[in-house]
């Protein structure tokens, strides 16, 4: 039901252009502040990204257009980097005998702008615009985790890994079920590129959220899902009967929403 609500909100955001400017701004802010974090909590990353981008487009139209234009202007160079970077990885994956596909992921417009603001840097100094995603079929279900690390070891022989930027979401899944191994490798041109290693199952969970998570897991209900229900009830209470300090309370709710997703990764 909640995932259907996220899809409805996503569809509604696409029709904002027909509304009055003040209505656009209100809905965009509401979407960015509540619905995008909720989509993230449900593991609906595609919808989360689109909600963020659509909200940003209506709240900051000039900045949105500027970043969109710069992404378009640099697309050819990114495609070239992607092909050159992944060619030896494909050869190595072929040697391993795994069924796989390799995709390019470009940082979203909202994420780029957000990083520009927090890091106080221009677009030209955002160096993680491109990420590479390796999606594979494990040899068998029991080897899924081992296959992730085997791929990591294999591609680390091709490119130098960044020792401080290994994120093991395989052994330590996020609260919304997300699993992947994130590594950062230095390409031949000296550029650091993030590589996300996922099985097809992990990718389904990343794309479809809890719907896919429970499809692969027998039974139902979990502590995390219970926490999500509590968060949703609290949000509903605030929206139904707003208090003078409702905005401050929403800040607290957003913090609590992600509290169970804090991990510390340290190099061995």
What are these regions (language model features)?
Residues 1-2, 9-268:
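Nucleic-acid processing machinery
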């Amino acid at each position: 039901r909640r995932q259907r609500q996220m899809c409805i909100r996503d569809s509604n955001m696409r029709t904002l252009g027909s509304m009055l400017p003040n209505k656009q701004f209100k809905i965009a802010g509401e979407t960015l502040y509540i619905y995008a974090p909720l989509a993230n909590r449900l593991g609906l990353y595609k919808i989360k990204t689109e909600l963020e981008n659509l909200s940003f487009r209506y709240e900051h139209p000039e900045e949105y257009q500027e970043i969109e234009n710069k992404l378009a202007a640099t697309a050819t160079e990114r495609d070239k980097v992607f092909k050159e970077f992944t060619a030896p990885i494909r050869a190595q994956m072929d040697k391993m005998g795994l069924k796989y596909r390799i995709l390019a992921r470009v940082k979203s417009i909202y994420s780029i702008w957000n990083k520009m603001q927090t890091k106080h840097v221009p677009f030209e100094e955002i160096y993680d615009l491109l990420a590479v995603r390796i999606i594979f079929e494990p040899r068998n279900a029991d080897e899924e985790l081992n296959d992730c690390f085997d791929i990591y070891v294999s591609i680390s022989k091709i490119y130098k890994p960044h020792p401080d930027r290994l994120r093991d979401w395989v052994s330590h899944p996020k609260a919304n079920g997300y699993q992947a191994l994130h590594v950062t490798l230095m390409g031949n041109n000296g550029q650091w590129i993030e590589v996300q290693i996922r099985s097809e199952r992990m990718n389904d969970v990343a794309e479809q959220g809890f719907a896919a998570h429970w499809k692969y897991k027998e039974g139902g209900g979990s502590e995390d899902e219970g926490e999500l229900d509590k968060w949703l009830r609290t949000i509903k209470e605030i929206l139904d009967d707003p208090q003078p300090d409702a905005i401050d309370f929403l800040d607290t709710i957003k913090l609590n929403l992600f509290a169970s997703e804090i991990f510390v990764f340290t190099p061995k």
